[in-house]
Amino acid sequence: MAIERTFSMIKPDATKRNLTGAITKMLEDAGLRVVASKRVWMSRREAEGFYAVHKERPFFGELVEFMSSGPTVVQVLEGENAIAKNREVMGATNPANAAEGTIRKVHALSIGENSVHGSDAPETAAEEIAYWFSGTEIVG
């Protein structure tokens, strides 16, 4: 099993409901370790840059609006198979389809306000981590 790092974000719908600690605990209880964390309020420009891969999708404007509507907590998580483990703990994008006990099943309000984001592959993890953190901010 490989120790790897992944990117995780607690979205505005969750931070506004003071769920940062509860969500982080779920991640840590699954064996993931937070090696970098900061609370940020994304500008529209930052949200557009971070979600540029979705630029041509019909929901892009709404996504940017939502992500810049309040604070987010961006994190780097580390652990064995961290990418897959984080995605398992998050649950399906649509909370109606998420497994019991997952972050989205427990905390998400809707498919749009689904509380968390996590990298889906090593390449995206590296890109997303670099978008928000310098190397000196990650301390394992």
From Swiss-Prot:
Q: Which Pfam families does the record cross-reference, listed alphabetically?
A: NDK
Q: What is this protein called?
A: Nucleoside diphosphate kinase
What are the TM regions of this chain, as residue ranges? none
Q: Disulfide pairs? A: none
> Per the database entry, which stretches of residues form a coiled coil?
none
- In which domain of life is the source organism classified? Bacteria
| Magnesium listed as a keyword | yes
What molecular function does GO assign, one term?
A: nucleoside diphosphate kinase activity
Per the record, what are the reactions this protein catalyses?
A: a 2'-deoxyribonucleoside 5'-diphosphate + ATP = a 2'-deoxyribonucleoside 5'-triphosphate + ADP; a ribonucleoside 5'-diphosphate + ATP = a ribonucleoside 5'-triphosphate + ADP
Q: What is its EC number?
A: 2.7.4.6
Protein family membership: Belongs to the NDK family.
Q: Which residues form the active site?
A: H117
Q: Which GO terms describe its biological process?
A: CTP biosynthetic process; GTP biosynthetic process; UTP biosynthetic process
Q: Does the keyword Kinase apply?
A: yes
State the PANTHER family in the record: NUCLEOSIDE DIPHOSPHATE KINASE (PTHR11349)
- Quaternary structure and interacting proteins, as annotated: Homotetramer.
Entry's Gene Ontology cellular component terms: cytoplasm
Query: Where, by residue number, does ATP bind?
Result: K11, F59, R87, T93, R104, N114
Q: Where in the cell?
A: Cytoplasm
InterPro entries in the record, alphabetically? NDK-like_dom, NDK-like_dom_sf, Nucleoside_diP_kinase, Nucleoside_diP_kinase_AS
Q: Keywords of this protein's UniProt record, alphabetized?
A: ATP-binding, Cytoplasm, Kinase, Magnesium, Metal-binding, Nucleotide metabolism, Nucleotide-binding, Phosphoprotein, Transferase
Q: What does this protein do?
A: Major role in the synthesis of nucleoside triphosphates other than ATP. The ATP gamma phosphate is transferred to the NDP beta phosphate via a ping-pong mechanism, using a phosphorylated active-site intermediate.
**Required cofactor names:** Mg(2+)
